[in-house]
Amino acid sequence: MTRHPTAIDDESLIAALRLASGSDPVPARVTDAARAAFGLRLPDATTARPVATPVPRGVRSAEEPRLLRFTAAELTVELEITSLDGLVDLAGQVTPCPEAGTLVEIRTLHLTESRALSPTGQFAVTGLPPGWFSVVCRRPGDSPVVTSWTRIRP
């Protein structure tokens, strides 16, 4: 036997929605976090998506260092993440090596660190807090490439 859901008329539905919207307001901390997250978006950027990185042969533990790779159509961002004393160190390389004047920004929810790339496309940041991060590559004359947000746990 098939059960059919009880039909609800439009007036009852609207009354229920009004009742629900007034009785459970969104907490201020949730609204503040949503505004902060919205402020971190880069609408003109190309998003580099994560790509699986195999654990190198001969490695006994996949815990340290952690390797991540992100790719967009024309760019790859490779990251090596290590943790020490509750803080995070991040070393990375952008390939193919962008032209001189290219900057990377390592963004967390609370701070942004900027670095110029070395001639071989490498960069490093030490002492980051654990948590969510994203890397933005800003190349002169091109739209930025941004990695998806990734969570680092020490």
Which ranges hold each PLM region?
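Positively biased amphipathic helices and basic secretion/translocation or surface-docking motifs
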Residues: 1-61
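Beta-strand-rich domain onsets/edges
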Residues: 35-89, 95-99, 151-154
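Glycine-centered tight beta-turn/hairpin loop motif at sheet-sheet or coil-to-beta transitions
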Residues: 72-76, 110, 141-142
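Exposed beta-strand and adjacent loop surfaces of beta-rich binding modules
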Residues: 89, 101-103, 132
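Glycine-centered loop-to-beta-strand initiation motif
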Residues: 92, 116-135
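Short amphipathic beta-strand segments in non-cytosolic proteins
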Residues: 98-114
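Conserved structural position at the C-terminal beta-strand
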Residues: 137-139
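Edge beta-strands of extracellular beta-sandwich domains
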Residues: 142-154
